[in-house]
């Protein structure tokens, strides 16, 4: 293990808060404001949601380059820059009133999300303290688990009392202040102290060993399927429960259960991390997801609560697994680029979720069955790398 990457200071709570801001502003917020946004721009709801979805595809296109920048300049610098870009994007949304301005705004927001999300925050934690990165990644995900709740409550208040443009200003200010915190208060001194003294280490995909290529490919499959399943399920839960129980209030209650149980899953990960292989906890978590999708088909309120608890714990654990497992096989000096490769299909899974949810919107049971069949992929992905030798 590289001594320069052990025991450094990690602003872990600041990184966690940055994920509340990033995911709240650039992912969760559009679920609440899409109707008002379409009216403001004079566009159809379908066109508006399509453009929002397309902004997520930007992650697929630039994730490898973001990974390169993360290795070259450090995760905190990339994160700070991404937050500033997102702030500009929401200011542009505040002023725009046409399709062209909307496209430009969402381009900036897409670039920002790629540069300021979990992928970069996890890389920063690994660069700063390789030895304790699993614990730090888990703490970061604690904050991310409550991003949707904080975002939806805040946006709901602003929308009801101050209107759509106040939301854009609030999100822009939040992103700007978070970026400014990293830029001024931390000033990157702690990160620089832990960066390698030599130039950026070579990392060429074609020059990787067969084992390294297999590991990256497996983790790409894991990331794509896990986030496709989670994002599609999360976007479809209210409609699914409403169709089964014919009661919107019950649907909202059931759909909200998984969020707190993500925290439970991540607490368990932190509790057992000292003596359990991250791949093993990931295997257990990946079994929770298909189990939850099986029992969710039973139209019983209490059974569905159990299903949502299992789903939340499963995804909560798998977020940590996906963030940490690459570090078992690759050095901190190249982790940004490794995660860049892995993040591209992961982002593709997230971007496909609105489209997939829309296809099955009239038959939610078929969607759940499809996702259930797909859920074997994360399990077998982790199973295949379980016996592979790690660098520790």
Range-by-range predicted roles:
Residues 26, 30-37, 212-270:
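Extracytoplasmic gate region of multi-pass secondary transporters
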Residues 277-325:
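C-terminal transmembrane helical hairpin of 12-TM major facilitator-type secondary transporters
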Residues 61-99:
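Conserved MFS/SLC helix-loop-helix module at the cytosolic interface between two early adjacent transmembrane helices
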Residues 148, 332-364:
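A late C-terminal transmembrane helix in Major Facilitator Superfamily
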Residues 100-116, 303-317:
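Hydrophobic core of transmembrane alpha-helices in multi-pass small-molecule transporters
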Residues 11-36, 41-45, 62-66, 152, ...:
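Extracytoplasmic
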Residues 115-129, 317-330:
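Intracellular juxtamembrane helix-capping segments at the cytosolic ends
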